[in-house]
Structure formats: structure tokens, C-alpha cells
């Protein structure tokens, strides 16, 4: 079964909720570092601070991550696969030392953040839609890393 129109709509609506509140970007990185403190050095905007501090670079990176998952949902609905548009994405992830467990941490942080952003609209169906879209993106990035 492919990515459904309803799943795409769920990702779209919760993506809009995420974008409305910049504090969700801080929450996203706070969850990542709680789960994987050593990942701090992978992010230039975090490595010199004692804790997660809001900044334009943090906001931009969080929006890029969530935006790419959102775009993955659109691609999955349209063609059934995710193609990474940025040819350097695989190389950047290799350079930063990203390995499979990091993708799991980011997925968990993404889902927890979307759950918070969605509030009472959160459901298993919404979670599954984001999870499938994220897995599509993660697979495309891993492919670009090889």
C-alpha cells in the first residue's frame, strides 16, 4: 500500500502547526541530545553551548529537517519513492559521522516533537504518516551515503 492522500494531509496539517511555534525547534534538539548527548558535536550551532539555545541556525536546520520529511510525504504520495534533491546530503552525513542509530534518534525526536505540536490532534494515524515519510527520507539519505 502506498502513501495515501489522508497521510499526506496529516503530515501537511501538522507541519503547519510545527512551523507556527519556533520553540518546537528547540524541543526537537533537546530531545535529540537527551537521547544521544554525543550527537551535540555534529551540529555547529550546538557544539559551543552548554544547552540547546534558540538561534537562527537552529531554527533553519530544524525547519529544513521537518521540511524534508514533509517533502518526502509529498514525493511518496506522488511517486511512491523519495529522491533527495541535495546531492551533497549524503556526503555531509558521512562527514558528520552519522550512523544508523542516529537516524533512529532523529525519528524518535521528530515524532515526539510533532506529537507536542499537534496536541489533541495527535493520533496513531498521524504518527504513522510521519514515520513512513521519515523512513522514506532516511532511506534516501542512506542511499546517498553509499
UniProtKB/Swiss-Prot annotation:
The modification Nitrated tyrosine is found at residues 24, 29, 134. Heme b binds at residues 44, 64, 93, 96. The keyword Lipid metabolism does not apply. Signal peptide: none annotated. O2 binds at residue 61. Induction: Strongly reduced levels in boron-deficient nodules. Inhibited by abscisic acid (ABA) in parallel with lower nitrogen fixation in nodules. InterPro entries: Globin (IPR000971), Globin-like_sf (IPR009050), Globin/Proto (IPR012292), Leghaemoglobin-like (IPR001032), Leghaemoglobin_Fe_BS (IPR019824). Nitrated in effective nodules and particularly in hypoxic conditions; this mechanism may play a protective role in the symbiosis by buffering toxic peroxynitrite NO(2)(-). Nitration level decrease during nodule senescence. Phosphorylation at Ser-44 disrupts the molecular environment of its porphyrin ring oxygen binding pocket, thus leading to a reduced oxygen consumption and to the delivery of oxygen O(2) to symbiosomes. This is Leghemoglobin Lb120-1.
Amino acid at each position: 500500500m502506498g502513501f495515501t492522500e489522508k497521510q499526506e494531509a496529516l503530515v501537511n496539517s501538522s507541519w503547519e502547526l510545527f512551523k507556527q511555534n519556533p520553540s518546537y525547534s528547540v524541543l526537537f534538539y533537546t530531545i535529540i541530545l537527551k537521547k544521544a548527548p554525543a550527537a551535540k558535536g555534529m551540529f555547529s550551532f550546538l557544539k559551543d553551548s552548554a544547552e540547546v539555545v534558540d538561534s537562527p541556525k537552529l531554527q533553519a536546520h530544524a525547519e529544513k529537517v521537518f521540511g524534508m520529511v514533509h517533502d518526502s510525504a509529498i514525493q511518496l504520495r506522488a511517486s511512491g519513492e523519495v529522491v533527495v534533491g541535495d546531492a551533497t546530503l549524503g556526503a555531509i552525513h558521512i562527514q558528520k559521522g552519522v550512523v544508523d542509530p542516529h537516524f533512529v534518534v532523529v525519528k524518535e525526536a521528530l515524532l515526539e516533537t510533532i506529537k507536542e505540536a499537534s496536541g489533541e490532534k495527535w493520533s496513531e494515524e498521524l504518527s504513522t504518516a510521519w514515520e513512513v515519510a521519515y523512513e522514506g527520507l532516511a532511506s534516501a539519505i542512506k542511499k546517498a551515503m553509499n
